[in-house]
Amino acid sequence: MIGFFGYALKTRSPSLSGGLKRYVRASLYRHAGGRVVRTENRAGEADFSPVVQVDGQCLIVPKSVWREHPFDEELFRDFHLYDVDFCVCIACRYANYICHSVFGEHGSVGSYDDDRYRNVLLFQRRWDGCLPLTVVPMSPREVREAETFAAYKFYKRVLSEGRSAYVPFARSMYRRYRTGRADLRLLRHALHYALILCRRRLRHG
């Protein structure tokens, strides 16, 4: 499969938008905040970089592979995570690449609604025992660093958005890889989440 934006790693930890920048592979113009941003990250000078994930804005795949691994529209309803699930299926048997000889263009910045979080949880249930997947050599320390970063970012967003239905799940994922430094960085978001809960209780009497 070929696309224009992706990641060389899929962590075991849940991730909403990839992970550490060093694993990004891209040749893409993105529309964000009224601007068009050029993003280019490649592995060496080759025209194609191997990846695990390809962003769903463009997925180029042979029809025979598509027939073998179609989108799971029953499990991943409402748009989100179908592409990550599809990519992991392909990566387990074939190969995924980011093309650098042509630039793609993406006009959406994505959304983080409740459906997205629900589908993240479903994805984790399906693939937890098979992750992480990587196409680059990584030491155990580098793997743990990537896992901690992804788990921290996910838990932080869940807290800051007050997604109480997903806090227990995010917390359990984070505890696998927590560090003292990450705990300190999360403190402000945990306090913000507590304030959100207090306001909800006051509002509903």
Task: Identify the function of each model-found stretch.
Residues 10-16, 55, 105-114:
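Short catalytic/ligand-binding loop motif for oxyanion handling, primarily in non-cytosolic enzymes
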Residues 2-29:
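Short beta-strand-to-loop element that shapes/binds the nucleotide-sugar donor at the catalytic cleft/hinge
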Residues 53, 63, 67-89, 96-105:
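Donor nucleotide-sugar recognition loop
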Residues 97-142:
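Active-site donor/metal-binding and catalytic loop motifs
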Residues 20-45:
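A contiguous catalytic/ligand-binding core that recognizes phosphate-bearing ligands
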Residues 40-61:
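A recurrent flexible, glycine/aromatic-enriched loop bordering the glycosyltransferase active site
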Residues 142-205:
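Non-catalytic, C-terminal membrane-associated alpha-helical segments of glycosyltransferases
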Residues 58, 79, 147:
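Residue-level marker of regulatory loop/turn positions in helix-turn-helix DNA-binding domains and
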